């Protein structure tokens, strides 16, 4: 859905994501406490922290699947609006962790998975089914999977499966991607290829990305900005300004792999 010129100007200055004094509890335990942060259009933000620090909890709260603590838990604003609304469905692409290899009895193809993403498209009600194939093919092209489009997902590598999930999100015409550990279960070449893809989406498509990763080296190479989360925000800035990269990497649940084949800014 096209935005008016006035709406585009307003969105250019309004952060895609605004979080104010956010606190979230799970099973009666406070996991996130008084977080404040903004994410602006076209930013690639990496979210790191030890296991149990609230990274996935934060993503689920942004998606509206978890609620702030009642009365005192702060707020989440998306595209200048209060909370996750129905109109946001097509604008936010959720990329969960791909997990283990798909069983052989699952016979769905890459193209069929990606076409599912078009069901959330903002323009579906305007253009109808005639644009479904075009959007799916465009998404496959963006992630480099055109030649795998008719392959069954059980035959994909970890990196190819993760690209398929990203393509499904892109097919919805999302302009804000939330990714939860997309590098898990992929080999080094696939990891670097995925990071290059995300970097290209930011620079060429002006995509906004918030990505959770336990791989501090990889996310530092790719992201414009790093947020280190442990209960609250302990660091928020460029990766080169991290106060002590080696000590952060030594915390539980974070890996720091030296690699000269990554890319960065």
Predicted regions and their residues:
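Catalytic Walker B motif of ABC-type/P-loop ATPase nucleotide-binding domains
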Residues: 177-181
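H-loop (His-switch) and adjacent beta-strand-loop-beta switch element
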Residues: 226-238
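H-loop/switch region of ABC-family ATPase nucleotide-binding domains
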Residues: 213-214
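Conserved ABC ATPase "signature" region
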Residues: 115, 129-148
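Conserved ABC transporter NBD signature motif
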Residues: 71-88
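Conserved catalytic motifs of ABC-family nucleotide-binding domains
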Residues: 173
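Conserved ABC ATPase signature
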Residues: 152-156, 160
């Amino acid at each position: 859905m096209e935005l008016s010129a006035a709406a585009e100007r307003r969105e250019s200055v309004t952060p895609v994501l605004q979080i104010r004094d956010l606190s979230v509890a799970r099973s009666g335990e406070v996991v996130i406490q008084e977080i404040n942060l903004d994410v602006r259009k076209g930013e690639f933000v990496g979210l790191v922290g030890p296991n149990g620090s609230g990274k996935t909890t934060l993503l689920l709260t942004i998606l509206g699947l978890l609620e702030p603590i009642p009365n005192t838990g702060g707020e989440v604003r998306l595209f200048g609006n209060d909370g996750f609304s129905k109109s946001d469905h097509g604008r936010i692409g959720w990329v969960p962790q791909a997990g283990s290899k798909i069983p052989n009895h699952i016979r769905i193809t890459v193209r069929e998975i990606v076409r599912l993403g078009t069901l959330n498209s903002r323009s579906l009600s305007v253009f109808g089914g005639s644009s479904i194939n075009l959007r799916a093919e465009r998404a496959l092209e963006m992630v480099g999977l055109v030649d795998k489009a008719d392959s069954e997902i059980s035959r994909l590598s970890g990196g190819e499966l993760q690209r398929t999930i990203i393509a499904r999100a892109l097919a919805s015409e999302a302009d804000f991607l939330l990714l939860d550990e997309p590098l898990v279960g992929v080999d080094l070449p696939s990891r670097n290829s995925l990071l290059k893809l995300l970097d290209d989406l930011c620079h060429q498509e002006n995509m906004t990305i918030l990505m959770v990763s336990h791989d501090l080296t990889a996310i530092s190479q790719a992201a414009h900005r790093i947020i280190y989360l442990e209960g609250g925000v302990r660091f928020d800035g460029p990766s080169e300004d991290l106060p002590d990269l080696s000590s952060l990497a030594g915390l539980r649940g974070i890996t720091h792999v030296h690699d000269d084949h990554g890319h960065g800014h």
